[in-house]
Design a protein with these regions (language model features):
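N-terminal loops that bind phosphate or other acidic moieties
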Residues: 1-131, 135-373
């Protein structure tokens, strides 16, 4: 029997690989001759970098960069030597959790560009970048400035930083690093489909949670529109209505227009990066899971992405979770053949989330399930 295990992290309890290895221990206790392949799993959001570093034996690279409000922050990325790939989350450089401030008119993505530039300096040319959790609404201008682009006002001077700069931009000077950047492959984990501007765009949908007040909304959106129009003239591309252009305060748009980036649903991108599909081609059973299995899981979260891949090759898919809601039955229709909560007996949330307890529960549940297979 061949089993492929790809379990998302149980936040505050087990990392993806810890959960996966606990499942493996349980399977082998029941089926000593089973071939069990454990792969890291993430959805492109928080924790993706750590999951891939641990699961693919990558290297963590710490870098001091410019934070969203121009203060130095400690960011990092993962280096996957085998594929010469950097894995990073923009939130480590320009995330909303880095500061108590919420000032989108000045918040910048400059540090994201610095992080990319550091990786390029090491000879890295392939990038997987998660762009969730941003504090910014600058259209990615800060990032592009760090990468050598110049955004100029009507006087031919620097237009400034943050959302306030967008309305001032009248021209763009192409980066002196353009040839170097053209050698890079940017794959962006993006699960939102919002355009750049308008009522469903970056500013109106995500701006309020970043501190954009009602009176500033139309001002910032108009600035974003101006930036898009200037960009279209410079790049001969008009991606302002592309799905995901409005992600991370317009960072998705910057990747599309200036860096030829590819926006891909996070789970699809990660499954490709860890080569799960290759292992599933001859798998008998697939095991996945996450901390809580619910209706949102069925709507396309990581475990369902794994299940769909398993179905493609005729494998049965089992999911384990810390808790399972009534609405989780929707996961059966989404491709998960059967799911099981791992908590054994009455316990407090704190007890259930204890890492040692969670691993023991995971292994024990997996063992009992696989005794039937």
């Amino acid at each position: 029997m061949k089993v492929v295990v790809a379990v998302d992290s149980f936040k505050g309890s087990m990392t993806s690989m810890e959960a996966g290895m606990a499942v493996k221990a349980g399977i082998l206790a029941a089926k000593k001759d089973a071939e069990v392949i454990v792969k890291p799993l993430a959805d492109g959001g928080e924790g993706t970098t750590d999951a891939l570093i641990k699961g693919l034996k990558g290297e963590r690279v710490d870098v001091t960069v410019t934070g969203p409000y121009h203060e130095p922050v400690q960011a990092y990325y993962g280096y996957l030597r085998e594929s010469n790939t950097a894995v990073m989350e923009m939130a480590t450089a320009a995330g909303i959790t880095l500061s108590d401030k919420k000032e989108p008119m000045t918040a910048t993505t400059y540090g994201v560009g610095e992080l990319i530039l550091h990786a390029i300096g090491r000879g890295i040319r392939n990038f997987i970048i998660g762009i969730g959790g941003s504090a910014t609404n600058d259209g990615g201008v800060g990032m592009l400035k760090a990468l050598g682009y110049r955004f100029l006002d009507e006087k031919g001077e620097d237009a400034g930083e943050g959302g306030q700069a967008l309305a001032k931009i009248v021209s763009v000077e192409i980066s002196d690093k353009k040839e170097l950047l053209s050698q890079c492959n940017f794959r962006i984990a993006c699960d939102v489909t919002n355009p750049l501007c308008g009522s469903q765009g970056a500013t109106y949908i995500y701006g309020p949670q970043k501190g954009v007040t009602p009176d500033i909304l139309p001002v910032l959106d108009a600035g974003m529109k101006n930036y898009a129009e200037v960009t279209a003239k410079v790049t001969d591309k008009d991606n302002q209505n592309a799905a995901g252009a409005g992600a991370a305060g317009g960072l998705g748009f910057a990747f599309l227009n200036y860096l030829d980036g590819e926006l891909t649903p996070g789970i699809q991108l990660i499954l490709d990066a860890v080569h799960v599909e290759e292992e599933m081609k001859d798998a008998d059973v697939v095991v996945t899971g996450e901390g809580c299995l619910d209706y949102q899981t069925a709507m396309g979260k990581a475990p369902v992405g794994v299940a769909k891949l398993g179905k493609k090759y005729g494998a049965k898919t089992i999911a384990f979770a810390g808790s399972v809601t009534k609405e989780a039955v929707a996961c059966n229709e989404a491709g998960i053949d059967a799911f099981f909560p791992i908590v054994r007996g009455i316990s407090t949330l704190e007890e259930a989330m204890d890492p040692d307890t969670a691993k023991a529960n995971m292994a024990a549940t997996a063992e009992q399930v696989f005794r039937l297979l």
